[in-house]
Swiss-Prot record:
InterPro entries associated with the record: Ribosomal_L11_MeTrfase_PrmA, Ribosomal_PrmA_MeTrfase, SAM-dependent_MTases_sf
Domain of life assignment: Bacteria
Keywords annotated in UniProt: Cytoplasm, Methyltransferase, S-adenosyl-L-methionine, Transferase
One Gene Ontology cellular component annotation held by this UniProt entry: cytoplasm
Protein's organism: Clostridium perfringens (strain 13 / Type A)
Family designation: Belongs to the methyltransferase superfamily. PrmA family.
Reactions this protein catalyses: L-lysyl-[protein] + 3 S-adenosyl-L-methionine = N(6),N(6),N(6)-trimethyl-L-lysyl-[protein] + 3 S-adenosyl-L-homocysteine + 3 H(+)
Enzyme class: transferase
One GO MF term attached to the UniProt entry: protein-lysine N-methyltransferase activity
EC number: 2.1.1.-
Entry protein name: Ribosomal protein L11 methyltransferase
Major subcellular site: cytoplasm
SUPFAM superfamilies assigned: S-adenosyl-L-methionine-dependent methyltransferases (SSF53335)
Gene: prmA
Length: 313
């Protein structure tokens, strides 16, 4: 990026970060940054605990989170702002607590965005094995550690959001050497990459966003793996065969819509790992899963979020 850019930001809450990030990824923006004070406040800070975040978010004392999208001066910013406001309002009407939900815009120079934020994004360790590392950082794995290389400048998820973290932990528990994994809404490809690193035989990531598909493919190219496919489209329309595990880190309403397709895509006794579920929507997802013949095995919680692990009976 060179020259001057327009930063469009949404002031929100931690539980709304993922869906609001999705708004920006539906636009032709040049990058997305996520600032979540809850990832920093109250933690012992070390080289493996920082996600990317502007240090100024500490001033909010955990009250707000921010999603920022970056656009060129040639873009019609008034239209962008109007669209983002409309989509945020739709999220509010769906029952999601978006906090302030205000949309702001500011002119930024390249140095303000493209370089400074990188100082605050360091390798993140999840569980005992998985380390998510930005491509420009050096990290020497020890013991059984497995490193996932990621370019967070294009990523939908960076690894330290509660929903991503719980999905990684569930994959660590259920992925075996002969496992086939489907990752719905693959975004940056982070969960597909984790499944591959954990030893899955074959992994397929699918996404309806062509920008996400390109991002996932690029991130896969940074990692020494050859068993991941990334496909554009709906799950059953583009994927052949069945999986032993389906993972989906998306919002509860979409999970409920997808349950029937997931059922058709899973082998008998297959595992469905799903997160992105706020507490108020947890029972809705459980009821839908049980209605469609799944047995709920685990309900894990982290902050405002839930991860449900279910088996197809």
């Amino acid at each position: 990026m060179e020259g001057t850019w327009i930063e469009v930001r949404v002031i929100t809450k931690s539980e709304a970060l993922e869906p609001i990030s999705g708004i920006f990824y539906g636009l032709d923006c040049k990058g997305v940054a996520i600032e979540d004070p809850n990832d920093i406040l109250g933690r012992e800070q070390g080289p493996l605990t920082w996600d990317f975040a502007d240090i100024n978010i500490l001033e909010h004392k955990g009250k707000v989170a921010v999603v920022k999208g970056y656009f060129s001066e040639e873009d019609n910013i008034d239209d962008v702002i109007a669209y983002v406001k409309e989509r945020v309002e739709e999220l509010k009407e769906s029952g999601l607590d978006v906090g302030e939900g205000t949309v702001e815009a500011e002119k930024m120079f390249e140095e303000d965005w493209a370089n400074n934020w990188k100082k605050y994004y360091k390798p993140i360790k999840i569980g005992e094995k998985i380390v998510i590392k930005p491509i420009w950082e050096e990290y020497e794995p020890t013991g059984e550690e497995m490193v996932v290389e990621l370019d967070p400048g294009m990523a939908f998820g960076t690894g330290d959001h509660e929903t991503t973290r719980m999905c990684v932990q569930a994959l660590d528990k259920y992925v075996k050497a002969d496992t086939t994994v489907f990752d719905i809404g693959t975004g940056s490809g982070i969960l597909a990459l984790v499944a591959s690193k954990l030893g899955a035989k074959h992994v397929v990531g699918v996404d309806l966003d062509p920008v996400a598909v390109d991002s996932a493919k690029e991130n896969i190219s940074f990692n020494n793996v050859d068993n991941i496919e990334v496909l554009y489209g709906n799950l059953l329309d583009v994927v052949d065969g069945k999986a032993d595990i389906v993972v989906a880190n998306i919002i509860a309403e979409i999970i409920c819509i997808l349950v029937d397709d997931v059922k058709k895509a899973l082998n008998k006794d297959g595992i469905f790992i799903t997160s992105g579920i706020i507490h108020e929507r947890r029972q809705m997802v459980i009821d839908k899963l049980e209605q469609e013949g799944f047995e709920v095995m685990e309900v894990n919680k982290d902050g405002e979020w839930n991860c449900i692990v279910a088996k197809l009976k």
